[in-house]
Amino acid sequence: MSDQVVLLHGLGRSCASVARLQSGLEEMGFAALCWSYPSRRRRLAGHIEAFREWLRRQAFAGPVHFVGHSLGGIIIRGALADTPPVAIGRIVMIASPNQGAGVVSRFGRWPFSRAIFGLPLQDLGEKSPALMSLGVPEAEIGIIAGLRHFHPLNAISYVNLFHRAGHQHDGTVELANTQLEGATDSIAIDAHHTFICDHDE
């Protein structure tokens, strides 16, 4: 039987944003599926509990691997940190703000920000209590971070032109803030936060 992989997309995205990853995993022989969730409509704790409940309803045979982009990686981390509902294989977190995102700390309270990005924004600022209270799953965890600051199709890129000079970041999350104590490995690639899942590497 093929190893099973569950993918989670990021905030404001859909499973289409990780479709290339999913196809690549399937070509490699994995049984891959994506959990689709209404990313703007719940705070972080609500997403974590919804994902845990979804996992409990699945009939997985053997350990399950997980791949999460941005918020998706944080949800995976929270759902699997304590008494995980399934046997865990490996975890890959792609551009996930484990220590929060500075741009959220600076602009997350603005009404337009919450209108666009929804409820989770309250929990994704640097050192937010919701993030700092999360544990770390007992599993091999790989972190992939991006280093491309600007993409013309990403609105936050234009904000960052004036507010993030001198920092290594992917246009949304600082490189340092993707890191997680207890992670097995970490790499950084020349990719922008929003489009990192389509990067050739």
What kind of region is each of these model predictions?
Residues A81-E201:
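Helical cap/lid subdomain of alpha/beta-hydrolase-fold lipid enzymes
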